[in-house]
Amino acid sequence: VANLQWSGDGVYSMQQVEEEGIKLRYAVPKASTNLWFDGWCMLKSGIGKDKEKQQAAQAFVNYISRPDNVVRNMYYVGYTSVISGGEDKTIYDYIKYMYGSEDKKSVDYDLNYFFQQNGDNYNYVMKTSEEMSKGQLYAQYPTQDVMRRSAVMTYFGDQANKKISRMWIDMRCFDPRIKKNSK
């Protein structure tokens, strides 16, 4: 059985069924995938030249981007952190707490590509279970190989977006038992 989901939704699903003793894995197409990320932006039309609104918006983004708040959001929604935390290792420590393993069968999972900053000599390779290296950890922090073959989607225009939306619906609702009329 396969299901198409964003990584955060995949993590949520994996956590939910794990309580029932069901194990799910997260997979990324070998050819390519879109690079997914969430972010906040300040719209010019919403802030305009209002310095107080701009300051409030910047304060909010700064607040939710503090490592301690990033961890709270990761815990609550299951999505990847928007920042690495810089010199603050709170986010990395949280990931190790959630997905780390000291079992003899654990495997190395390299997160240097995400966390290592210029001049940082810390080695962000953690021990995790084989299961997590293909499950929740992999969904939140895919391997560097996956990141290399990922691309940011662009805006296609109204007509193309309608076609893409139709393709997405067809894919999500695909039922191999139903034969499509070829006429």
Task: Please tell me what each predicted stretch does.
Residues 1-29:
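Ligand-binding pocket segment of bilobal, Venus flytrap-like solute-binding proteins
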Residues 9-12, 41, 55-59, 68, ...:
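Extracytoplasmic/secreted proteins, especially bacterial periplasmic and envelope-associated proteins
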Residues 43-141:
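Mature extracytoplasmic/periplasmic domains
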Residues 117-183:
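Conserved C-terminal helix/tail region of periplasmic/extracytoplasmic solute-binding proteins
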